From Swiss-Prot:
GO terms for molecular function: 2-isopropylmalate synthase activity; acetyl-CoA C-acetyltransferase activity; manganese ion binding. The gene is leuA. This is 2-isopropylmalate synthase. Keywords: Amino-acid biosynthesis, Branched-chain amino acid biosynthesis, Cytoplasm, Leucine biosynthesis, Manganese, Metal-binding, Transferase. Belongs to the alpha-IPM synthase/homocitrate synthase family. LeuA type 1 subfamily. It catalyses: 3-methyl-2-oxobutanoate + acetyl-CoA + H2O = (2S)-2-isopropylmalate + CoA + H(+). Gene3D superfamilies: 1.10.238.260, 3.30.160.270, Aldolase class I. Its EC number is 2.3.3.13. Coiled coil: none annotated. It is an enzyme of class 2 (transferase). Pfam families: HCS_D2 (PF22617), HMGL-like (PF00682), LeuA_dimer (PF08502). Homodimer. Catalyzes the condensation of the acetyl group of acetyl-CoA with 3-methyl-2-oxobutanoate (2-ketoisovalerate) to form 3-carboxy-3-hydroxy-4-methylpentanoate (2-isopropylmalate).
């Protein structure tokens, strides 16, 4: 029987540290529930001591999500560990993940502590965490740049103190695969008691080697990999979950290892994380990128038509990318719409289905055929959203080479109709100024990205917008329409609804 590799997902903690990413509690819960469907072993829900928002996010996941271990990060001090437990105490399977750096550069310049002091601090932290839960993980920050023999001493000490998982990070993404594999092998051979715990790795992607280093570690005895969906994370990101999992699966004859991941949920999870974080997946991204299973070369196309295995080592359906001959359009009924959503893996409540179907019909009037990508965009816009305080009723824009761009907008604000007009430096600017006049709200633009969902002149425009509020929180909004300006307006209205939702949530806490 093959050995198990545990998948520790840190999308909600390390992934959310990506510049410009900020998830509200509702969004964190959506991702957490999808991670349960994906069947990860551990969800690291956040860093409870870092901020009240992080604490509430971890607490919400701990309370609501079942069937998975929920971890909270804590520095190796009493205040952090106590706060982590306060957030995690209602979890079905709580894990406290405590850490301290072990490399000399961190000890000298950041911690200003001796090696012995760090070792004692690590042991005390594990003992304190162990007083709360039997599941305790210890991480030696910047482990790869640490003295190997000192690191082995620290790990042996925390294992003796009760740690059940020891994590060996390549915190700055400095390692090469052969080096990191040998490093893990050395630790496995020179750390007393290590055979009684799970050895974990956490690799960063600064040199583009996070996945390769993770697989090298697994090859040499690691049995937990810490990773994020789409590889998101601070700086250049983390090891991509989908690449680690499919690497182990596709080359199972080499590794002889399994994970518990439900691979058919990979693509859906990737799309959800991309939508909620506002971080698009690069087209040539392995496993989940738009081009991952496309073949343009004539020779490649000929080979794939004759036998897919000539140029495809993974079947797209294996990761949840489906193919269909069913085409939806303006004459399609609710039954066909629901059937296709079911085939794509979306399970909607009746109210959600009704909202999505209304939006589908609106878009089908302006687009001859609605593709699977269009359907996913519709669901991103209409289903995965907060309650609507603001709703777009209509938008009229006047623009041209000799005309001052002017927008007239009609909004429903808590059901009351409001109309405003504004001029701007361009049609989008005029539209946003009209929205700001109507709502009395104005935010700072961080980024504006427009993408065609599919090809063709009737393709849906997908606008992803990021705005910063007065408290420097960054919000992501998305709008979809065959009209670029309408999509832009919908994205801004979406952001305003998120901000209002967060404000009301904070008032009631």
């Amino acid at each position: 029987m093959s050995e198990r590799v545990y998948i520790f997902d840190t999308t909600l903690r390390d992934g959310e540290q990506s510049p410009g990413v900020s998830l509200n509690i509702r969004e964190k819960l959506q991702i957490a529930h999808q991670l349960v469907k994906l069947n990860v072993d551990v969800i690291e829900a956040g860093f409870p001591f870092a901020s009240p928002g992080d604490f509430k996010g971890v607490q919400a996941v701990a309370r609501e999500v079942r069937g998975v271990s929920v971890a909270g990060l804590a520095r190796a001090n009493a205040a952090d560990i106590d706060r982590a437990w306060e957030a995690l105490c209602e979890a079905e399977q709580p894990r406290i993940h405590t850490f301290i750096a072990t490399s000399d550069i961190h000890l000298q310049h950041k911690l200003r502590m001796s090696r012995e002091a760090v070792l004692e601090t690590a042991v005390e932290a594990v003992r304190r965490a162990k007083g709360y839960t039997s599941d305790v993980e210890f991480s030696a920050e910047d482990a790869f740049r640490s003295d190997p023999d000192y690191l082995c001493r620290v790990l042996a000490a925390v294992i003796a103190a009760g740690a059940t998982t020891v994590n060996i990070p390549d915190t700055v993404g400095y390692a090469m695969p052969d080096e990191f594999g040998a490093f893990i092998a050395y630790i496995m051979d020179h750390t007393p008691g290590i055979e009684n715990v799970v050895v974990s790795v956490h690799c960063h992607n600064d040199l583009g080697l996070a996945v390769a280093n993770s697989l090298a570690a697994v090859r040499n005895g690691a049995r937990q990999v810490e990773c994020t969906v789409n590889g998101i994370g601070e700086r250049a990101g983390n090891a991509a979950l989908e690449e680690v999992v499919m690497g182990l699966f596709t080359r199972r004859e080499k590794y002889g290892l399994i994970t518990g991941i439900q691979c058919e949920e990979i693509y859906r999870t990737s799309k959800l994380v991309s939508t909620l974080t506002g971080m698009p997946v690069q087209f040539n991204k392995a496993i989940v990128g738009k081009n991952a299973f496309l073949h343009e070369s004539g020779i490649h196309q000929d080979g794939v038509l004759k036998e897919r295995a000539t140029y495809e080592i993974i079947c797209p359906t294996m990761v949840g990318i489906t193919r269909t001959n069913l085409v939806l359009g303006k004459h399609s009924g609710r039954h066909a719409f629901r059937q296709r959503l079911t085939e794509l893996g979306f399970e909607l409540h009746e109210e959600e289905l009704n909202r999505a179907f209304v939006r589908f019909k609106e878009l089908a009037d302006s687009k001859k055929q609605i593709t699977d990508e269009d359907l996913e965009a519709i669901l991103d816009e209409t289903i995965r959203q907060v309650p609507a305080t603001y709703e777009l009723d209509y938008l009229h824009v006047f623009s041209g080479t000799t005309v001052k761009p002017t927008a007239v907008i009609g909004l429903l604000i808590d059901g009351q109709f409001v109309q405003e007009a504004a001029c701007g430096n361009g049609p989008v600017d005029a539209t946003y100024k009209a929205i700001e006049k109507a709502t009395g709200r104005k935010y700072s633009l961080v980024s504006y990205v427009i993408d065609a969902v599919t090809g063709g002149t009737d393709a849906l425009a997908n606008v992803t917008l990021k705005m910063r509020d007065d408290d420097h929180r960054v919000y992501t909004g998305r709008g979809v329409s065959a009209d670029v300006l309408e999509a832009s307006a919908r994205a801004y209205v979406n952001i305003m609804n998120k901000i209002v939702y967060d404000e009301r949530t904070r008032k009631h806490e």
